[in-house]
């Protein structure tokens, strides 16, 4: 009985995530795993229509966190087919409610991450609603996100533009930028272990994250052709990007593929300059990526591509280029940067974005709102 009282005294959180629980944690996992005195049921989206993970038992990934995979919708139905659409939402709601009941969840805080989840609100019991917005959901009906933000007790927004867009729908919006595992990427505690490119002796300029189809790789292709003595590293999972075949033919381009998260810092510290590129499908986004905070945490020089009228990001420590020629010129300047010139300032920006500090800000906001 005393154990039950101890468990019930913890704040219970139902998390509807838009990303799986992973060894390479995303925003939701980074934040919730750091909230203290909580008991969390984390519902991850299915990997596809044939994903049967929902039939498995919940996976206890932390002493206070249990992960379930939601059942897939075999035949996605548009909202205009109201009866079938509602049936799908009821199915998901029953699944979540059943798991919550098994874990003795009563009046939990509901943490949402996608406008699609607004349709589950009528099928779940909760006491307090959070909407964490980390992107522009332009592919979804605006009314969905508006309704979710309007119902939420507090909205977290990853950038000023996202906060402005949601301001007509909520009077309680807190800006919460992305963050970084600062100890890992700053090299604290001797986390840098080996040289992943022992055979390369010239300058190395690197990009480290998923190579999305929409990623504009033209600046790297241009620079690789102009500077054959430089090595350009592309680290991460590769999608069907139209410029990848041409980059593969460049002898000074290294396509390293994906690697475990704990090995990424070794690759970044092997680079002389780190590169931030643009995604053509996100021309209006002002969300600062977690990748940039990882770069800053290393203290290494950074060259970032910018949209024509984009406000420069961290202009005192990041070189901002607007075209391929300027990109090449600034890469040269970055290579010539005096050691330690602004590296400590870069790392101070990374330290200020540590996920531990972001989670502490979430806790304060929830406590102020009476939700935690």
Regions found by a protein language model. Give the residues of each.
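Conserved donor-binding/catalytic core segment of Leloir-type glycosyltransferases
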Residues: 196-215, 220-224, 235
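Conserved acidic donor-binding segment of nucleotide-sugar-dependent glycosyltransferases
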Residues: 317-325, 333-339
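Nucleotide-sugar-dependent
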Residues: 22-26, 215, 262, 267, ...
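Carbohydrate-associated surface elements
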Residues: 161, 179, 188
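Membrane-proximal helix-turn-helix segments that form the acceptor-binding/catalytic region
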Residues: 97-98, 136-157, 162-166
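A charged, aromatic-enriched C-terminal amphipathic alpha-helix characteristic of glycosyltransferases
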Residues: 339-372
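Glycosyltransferase donor-sugar binding loop
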Residues: 232-242
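Nucleotide-activated donor-binding/catalytic signature segment of Leloir-type glycosyltransferases, i.e.
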Residues: 242-266
């Amino acid at each position: 009985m005393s154990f039950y009282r101890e468990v019930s005294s913890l704040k219970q959180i139902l998390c509807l995530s838009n990303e799986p629980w992973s060894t390479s944690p995303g925003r939701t996992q980074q934040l919730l795993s750091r909230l203290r005195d909580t008991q969390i049921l984390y519902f991850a989206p299915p990997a596809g229509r044939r994903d049967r993970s929902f039939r498995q038992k919940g996976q206890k990934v932390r002493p206070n966190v249990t992960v379930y995979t939601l059942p897939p919708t075999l035949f996605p139905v548009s909202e205009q087919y109201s009866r079938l659409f509602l049936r799908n939402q009821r199915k998901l709601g029953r699944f979540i409610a059943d798991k919550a009941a098994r874990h003795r969840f009563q009046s939990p805080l509901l943490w949402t991450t996608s406008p699609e989840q607004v349709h589950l609100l009528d099928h779940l019991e909760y006491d307090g609603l959070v909407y964490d917005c980390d992107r522009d959901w332009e592919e979804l009906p605006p009314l969905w996100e508006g309704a979710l933000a309007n119902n939420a007790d507090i909205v977290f927004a990853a950038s000023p533009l996202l906060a402005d867009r949601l301001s007509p729908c909520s009077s309680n919006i807190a800006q919460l930028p992305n963050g970084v595992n600062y100890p890992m990427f700053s090299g604290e505690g001797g986390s840098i272990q080996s040289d992943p490119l022992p055979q390369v002796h010239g300058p190395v300029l690197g990009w480290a994250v998923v190579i999305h189809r929409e990623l504009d790789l033209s600046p790297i292709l241009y620079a690789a052709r102009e500077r054959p003595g430089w090595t350009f590293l592309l680290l991460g999972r590769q999608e069907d990007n139209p410029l990848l075949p041409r980059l593969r033919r460049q002898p000074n381009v290294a396509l390293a593929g994906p690697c475990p998260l704990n090995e990424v810092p070794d690759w970044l510290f092997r680079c002389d300059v780190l590169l931030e590129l643009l995604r053509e499908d996100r021309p209006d986004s002002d969300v600062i990526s977690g990748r940039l905070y990882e770069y800053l945490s290393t203290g290494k020089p950074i060259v970032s591509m910018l949209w024509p009228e984009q406000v420069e990001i961290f202009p005192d420590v990041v070189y901002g280029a607007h075209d391929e020629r300027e990109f090449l010129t600034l890469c040269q300047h970055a290579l010539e940067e005096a050691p330690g010139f602004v590296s400590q300032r870069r790392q101070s920006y990374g330290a200020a974005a540590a996920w531990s500090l972001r989670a502490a800000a979430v806790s304060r906001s929830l406590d102020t709102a009476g939700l935690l």
